[in-house]
Structure formats: structure tokens, C-alpha cells
Amino acid sequence: MSARAGIVVTGTEVLTGRVQDLNGPWLADRLLELGVELSHITLCGDRPADIEAQLRFLADQGVDLIITSGGLGPTADDMTVEVVSRFCGRELELDPGLETRIGEIVTRLMARFPDVDPAAVIAANRKQAFVPDGAVILDPVGTAPGVVVPGTPTVVVLPGPPRELQPMWQAAVAADAVQTAIADRVSYRQDTVRMFGLPESGLAETLREAEGSVAGFDRLEITTCLRRGELEIVTRYEPRDADAYDGLLNMLRDKHSRELFSEDGALVDDQVAALLAGRTIATAESCTAGLLAARLTDRAGSSAYVAGGVVSYSNDAKTDLLGVDAELIAAHGAVSEPVAEAMAAGALQRFGADTAVAITGIAGPGGGTPAKPVGTVCFSVALADGTFLTRTSQLPGNRSDVRERSTTVAMHLLRRALSGGG
């Protein structure tokens, strides 16, 4: 059996949902890369009794390694190190070298705040220099050091802010106590494929068929997830079972060649960015109000190919900013394929681009009709050679869902237009 680990995410702000937990998923991925089985991720507030209860629960599960995040600050409710020390049966001790290091960091940070007494802040942060006897100290990225406490299980204590936790991870893994705890880890491969336009029920049917026809299928650990209207299929397996994974991938290719758009885990955003190299793109958006333009510019370097965009929410804006004929809108309605094509053509001309994408739809909750219910969205991709790729989709969900899914549909339509997929 592979080495097993558990994660304890602490913080009342995380427990109550005011702050999203980014550490649990990130740490889970890192453990997976190491070949360590993740047994549990638990969330608890800042109460010492609750933190200790999570530690004892994971220890009772027989995990080899526990990783905690959060509760390492200088305030009264930052109690994780003290709780872990008690759980591991160790005394807290002041580390003079660490105290000096934290003082230097605080002094440097306080230089930006001349009205604040650095000595008072250093005194408040002195608490962070107390560590369990025999623990390995992980150098702080902010003011909070991490610690590795050897034992059964070994406990790694990391800060809560991801910008401090993530740079500390490699040092934590390199600690002798952690290497001993995960010595029985198994080397796994993990592959991700992505599909668009296939319902989950269709994928489930294919996987049921694969169960009976792909040799070694039972040794594949398959996880499926619907994200932004796309299906993500993550498969983990031991290297010796590569043939089984190849068999599954071949079946997915045979049955869903049109829907399968990524075999290496690449996102459609990555693919579109690559396809836009050497081109310029403009956007014309109504119901999404700039969400597509924002998504296109999420990638560093997007200024090389994004020319600009227009949010033409009203009919007058479609006419004044994009040159859409008012009579066309009157004849077909603002949410129609002819208007989407006219918007895309207008964006091409306005920005001098060679590629344009237009979105016009009814995001709801009102505005729908029997002929065009809420969720009706029209898309058009226009190329400088006069080619148009135009579609109408009926998208499920609330207003936010429809708007977000619209950007995904537009990205895939753009991918198909630029790759010649049609």
C-alpha cells in the first residue's frame, strides 16, 4: 500500500466560506505528484480543541503524514503550532535564531510604515519563534515559519496564505522526517483529457463499455468532472498499466472524436492562445458584457493578438458601435444569428482584426419568450476571408451560469474556426 496523508485546513474564515480554500486542492495535487495517497481533507475553525480533534481523527485513520495550513500568525487565535506541539507530545521552545530572522523581516516590512513602532510589532511576532522541541524549521516567506515535527504520523505545519505556503513546500518535502513518512509511496502517472459537447451520461455509457472491453480497466483510477460545460477526465495509474490507459484513450477517440479536444490536459484557452499566434482578434459582446474579452486576456502575452472589444448591450450600441443595421435587428431580433454575424463583422472592421467573435443572448432571469427562452445564445466567429462560423445554443442554469457557459461555447467555436474543424 502506498504512503497515506491527510490535510487539515484551519481558519474560521475558511470554515464559514468567507475565504475560499486554495491550499487543500493545491496540496492534494502535490501529494498526488509524489505518489502519496490522500486519505482526507478536513476543515476546521481556529478553536484548539477542533484542530486537535482533526489531528487525532487522521492519526486514527493510520495516515503516515499530516499537513496543516493556517494558524501561524502572531495573533491570539493563531494556535496551530501550539496544538500540534501538544498533539506530538513536545514542548514549545523559543528558537533565538528564528526570533532574530523574524525580527529582521518585520523591520524590513515596517520600513514602509514610518508611523508604526517596529519594536512593538517585533514583540507581537515573537510568538512565531516558538517551535516544538526537535522540529525542523522551514524558513518563513512572510513572517510565519513552517515546521516539520517527526513522529507517527509526521506533521508538517504550513502557513495559510498560499503565497507563503507554496514556496515552502519543496523544503518541507525534502525534510528527512517527511521522506521517511512517505518512503512507501507508489509512482503513479496521471493523464487528463478534456471533452466538449458530450453529456456526462454519454461518457458514463462509454466507461461502462470500457469496463468490459479494455484489459486492465479495473486498475485505472478515473475521476470525471464537469467544468465550465467541459468534461474533464483524469486517470491515474501505475506505469505498468499504461496499456490499459492507452486502450481507454483509443476508445474515447473512436467514440467521441469530435468532442475530444485535448489529450494532454491543455485547456481550450491554451489552445486558442496558440492558434491566435500571428493573428489579431476582436470581440463583440452583448449578454456576456466583456467576459469573453477578459478570458482572452487572462493569458500573459495576450496583447500580441487581442486588438480590443466592444460591449454592445443595447440595440443602439450594436448599431452605433458595430454598424449593425437597425432593420436587421427589427427583422430578426437582437438575439439571432444574422445579428451575431453582423456584430462579428462590425468588430472586424472597427478594430482592423482578422478574427472576431460575437455573442448575443438572453441570460435571464427575464426577457425570454416561447420562441427564444432564457438561455438562448447566438454566437458567430468571423474571419477576414469572409468565413463565418455561427451557432445558436440553449444553455442551462441561472444568469451567471449562462454567461459563463457562453464564454466557453465561444472559445470552442473559435478553436474550431481557427483549426479548420468547423
Swiss-Prot record:
InterPro entries: CinA, CinA-like_C, CinA_C, Competence-induced_CinA, MoaB/Mog-like_dom_sf, MoaB/Mog_dom. Signal peptide: none annotated. It holds the Pfam family CinA. Belongs to the CinA family. This is CinA-like protein. It comes from Mycolicibacterium gilvum (strain PYR-GCK).
